[in-house]
Amino acid sequence: LSLSGTAADCLSGWSSYEGHCYKPFNELKNWADAEKFCTEQHAGGHLVSFQSSEEADFVVKLAFQTFDHSIFWMGLSNVWNQCNWQWSNAAMLRYKAWAEESYCVYFKSTNNKWRSRSCRMMANFVCEF
């Protein structure tokens, strides 16, 4: 029996789409706390990730049934600052002095666009497994 998200496999209160289960939470948390919360809800749980515009549309409709705010955390971040950075002269980046501020991505449902902001910002969120 697969627990990958058919309608019968989703926990009570969760919604199924394309083999995954989703649940919006009307709780304000920073990105790290929201991600931690999602991992505690179900094995394999995380903040929502989008593989298509159809999936995003499904989640936005689901989210609006739970909260009025137009933004919510999704599982994309640059917490570890591990982008493939390279100097303009093609030298490898060996010395790093990143500011402590890291950026996480939230979904702005009024225009279905992604935006980055401090990971310390408080927002609602959607979990997925």
Curated annotation (Swiss-Prot):
Gene Ontology molecular function: metal ion binding; toxin activity
Signal peptide: 1-8
Taxonomy, superkingdom: Eukaryota
Expressing tissues: Expressed by the venom gland.
GO CC terms: extracellular region
Broad class of where this protein is predominantly found: secreted
Disulfide bonds: 10-21, 38-127, 104-119
Location within or outside the cell: Secreted
Keyword line: Blood coagulation cascade inhibiting toxin, Calcium, Disulfide bond, Hemostasis impairing toxin, Metal-binding, Secreted, Signal, Toxin
C-type lectin domain location: 17-128
Subunit details: Heterodimer of subunits A and B3; disulfide-linked.
Comment field (misc): Calcium is required for ligand binding.
Protein function: Anticoagulant protein which binds to the gamma-carboxyglutamic acid-domain regions of factors IX (F9) and factor X (F10) in the presence of calcium with a 1 to 1 stoichiometry.
UniProt record similarity statement: Belongs to the snaclec family.
Protein name as catalogued: Snaclec coagulation factor IX/factor X-binding protein subunit B3
Organism: Trimeresurus stejnegeri (Chinese green tree viper)
